[in-house]
């Protein structure tokens, strides 16, 4: 039986429908080398609804797209497990399409293959896959996510990349504290933008920020010149910090840092110690970047009188980018906003105390450690005149204005004088438990029984940090003298500084504590002490006053080695009683001259501290006064503007009253005219009626 025309049409329609369905639904050929679903699946990077254009009928169909690994899957529904098709993104490129002026509501982008070998990997359309997002923001998110996947094998895509991976990738350019993008943005802002009003608060141009982001993600290094907008570069820096997969302070440390913020609100000194401990425990890359950013933000707030960006404003802007919870629900964000802002304020304001200035050449050294070298003490060296008293080699990782608290048991214990020479173990690592800027001295800590070796407490190391370690190298092992009871007053005489960035005084005026100390050293040790005093003088008396030491030394049995080595300038050397004259008799700490020198030094320390406090108070008062004046000026402007608006409203009210009176008068006139017309009409009709009646009466007799 021959097929009829209708059967032929049905067969052709069935074949056409089957072929069209296979093309539209994205089915791949079932050849042995082309499986339907790839075997290797990566993590889900992004998922959402998109519209894809069908290949034959060119209409749009909505599908659930999932970006997993380097493949883009699409499903008919969100709950389906079997994809209708997938697109391999390796070797492809994604492009944003300009909206059609006739139909501006479409947000289109397309994925095109990079070469002839990649074209067969796009199942729905061998040329390009056209997709449409629901909004401009959604389209930009999809394009950025797909580009990161495309550029990831090439070592690119710095935005959204883990900080450790970025640092590891840029290690070939040399040791750095921050990624190249951050350094480039910071250098440009430091050069051209510190005086820009509203820095980091005013947004940059969105399209320029996106172009710069794409350039950095592509591996390019765009240069900033005089035509580059400062706010655009600032927005790019904030965008990089915001798009880190894990913030600078990791998610696991979020609760610990919030606890530090709560402690800061109760006890600022203890909170600073705990915060420094938490900062030192950060990973190396995070630690370096946080230190770099806080130092830069401190430079920005130093120009707050011009750029109007105080520490609080910078903390508000950068706090959520530096420290944020892993699950950003509204309740958690509202509860931690004030704490995060306060914590960021402390990090910026006290960055010099919280971050130890470690060297880039020694990244393996942990934060907060002091390395004590070998130290040998022999009786033969004591007995020889002119011998180098105590050779001590100490290297320290404490550099900069970082504070340290040394344990009482950290110095090596030496044997008695009758025993053999005691040698301390060489190259020991002592971990400092805390970094502290304001040290609170307890009175009971000064007490120590007799016969116990010397203990040393170093609450603060000032900006010239190495003078302390060098100065301590001249100390000998000794016992506490009988005057240790009088040293109790030194702890109670301590008082905290009014501000955290002003080092607390150790009250050198407690002459009883100083008077109970006597020592005699050899000539070489004397030079070390003098050098330490010189460094102490260079680092300002306020920094020297922050050092509190407790010791009691027995008179040294050294014979007279040289004479006439006493410093000629007693008025400019704080450690002059330490140096001595080189004779076998120890200096008398109770002499009037030395007591006068000590009192003068104590008064100088107090005066320097009070001057620093007054200077800071004056700065704070000027700043608050300036802010009050600015607020008053704004209020005056607002009041004048309100008065002008009130005058305008009064004029409008007067005009409305005039119009109302005019309308009432017009209404009254209209009513009078209406009444007049009514009477005239009545008279007219009455006259007309009488005339009509008279005419009828005259006709009737006829």
UniProtKB/Swiss-Prot annotation:
Q: Which gene encodes it?
A: Arhgap22
Which GO terms label this protein's molecular function in UniProt? GTPase activator activity
Question: Does Phosphoprotein appear among the keywords?
Answer: yes
List the protein's name.
Answer: Rho GTPase-activating protein 22
Instruction: Return the Gene3D superfamilies for the record.
Output: Pleckstrin-homology domain (PH domain)/Phosphotyrosine-binding domain (PTB), Rho GTPase activation protein
The Rho-GAP domain is annotated at 161-355
Q: Could you tell me which residues belong to the region Disordered? A: 360-433, 438-457, 480-511, 555-596
Q: Where is the signal peptide?
A: none
According to the record's subunit comment, the protein's assembly and interactions are:
Interacts with VEZF1.
Q: What GO terms fall under cellular component here?
A: cytoplasm; glutamatergic synapse; nucleus
What positions are modified (Phosphoserine)?
Answer: 365, 397
Q: From the Swiss-Prot or TrEMBL record, state where the protein is found.
A: Cytoplasm; Nucleus
Explain what the record says happens when changing residue 201 to A: Loss of function
- Sites annotated Arginine finger: 201
